[in-house]
């Protein structure tokens, strides 16, 4: 459950693996109003260059995230919302979305808990993050 919280996923999710992949930067975008992948801050308003299709996708995603039968936290700022009650900061990892038609190369696929244990071991952190 802790990993689900860290990644800002709905509590009822049933994920059991994680996939690592490579993609060109121009094949990715961030789920923010300005969707740039090269800066470190998200603007709160759409830039003039935002296309109608992107604005529609963004607004649809907001509706689904907040107002569906299974709402879940979406920051809209390019990082996940870590909804664990015991964390001092609710800022999770950065979010990137693969653009439709982008080429990706799968580097590895592993069980989620195997990955979690390895990360915990490498960072000398106790499970629970």
Where do the protein language model's features map onto the residues?
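Conserved NAD+-utilizing ADP-ribose enzyme module
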Residues: 4-129
